[in-house]
Amino acid sequence: MMKNLRLLLLILVVQPSCTQQDTNDGDWTDIPYSDAAPLRTNSVGISEDYLHTNRGIWQKPDVVVDLLGDLENKVVADIGAGTGFFTYKILPRAEKVIAIDIDPEFINYLDSLKAINLPESQYWRLETRLAEPEMPAPINYQEVDVILVVNTYIYLEDRIKYLESLRENLKPGGKLVIIDFKKKRTPVGPPQDIRMPLYVVEEELYQAGFEYVHTNDTYLDFQYILTAEKQLSVN
């Protein structure tokens, strides 16, 4: 009963100002998050509350989404979707977004936002999937065109195997974008001792079979960006 009441209150608090439409148009980028949004406690027991750190400024979401490329008629997987910070910024540009998270509270939260923001005829454009610990992401073979992994990579178990699974489930020519915190002192982010240097992530992408790995540690103040592609034809 209390869980249902909490969800009802959450829906009322996050009621957005945008109107529902039967097209891809509309202001999806200003979903008002609230104190009712659940917090992430990661695999090492650290609570991450980026919603209250001016994330809309330091994360530079428009820059990140632009890096995903032309998303028209594309399917995008948002791994570690959390409260949907990127999910709802990608949705206006893509045909479909698959929001993946390991925490059922976030899945319930995203489903409640979907019921508010999308007309029923458009529900299929946002699908939530619950990930299992120490298991590959729940994505089917060659199901997606783009995969985004933000503030999540350092917590993955058996990362090479995980990346190999992502590569397999990307369509030929697909793109993987990984963003995580630089291994240095920053005002926000996890402790430095659990952060991963950019060059380590780069090497692991190559080990997993990705081609054309590009790195950037200047676009974002606190984070680095890696972009990897799956070649069009695989022997």
Where are the regions a protein language model picked out?
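Class I SAM-dependent methyltransferase SAM/SAH-binding core
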Residues: A77, A81-P136
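Conserved class I S-adenosyl-L-methionine
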Residues: V177-E202
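Class I SAM-dependent methyltransferase Rossmann-like catalytic core
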Residues: N42-W58
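Core SAM-dependent methyltransferase catalytic element
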Residues: T218-N235
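N-terminal, positively charged/glycine-rich alpha-helical extensions of SAM-dependent methyltransferases
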Residues: C18-I46
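A short glycine-rich, Lys/Arg-flanked "PGG" loop and its adjoining helix->strand segment in the class I
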Residues: I160-K175
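Conserved alpha-helix/loop element of class I SAM-dependent methyltransferases that forms part
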Residues: R55-K74
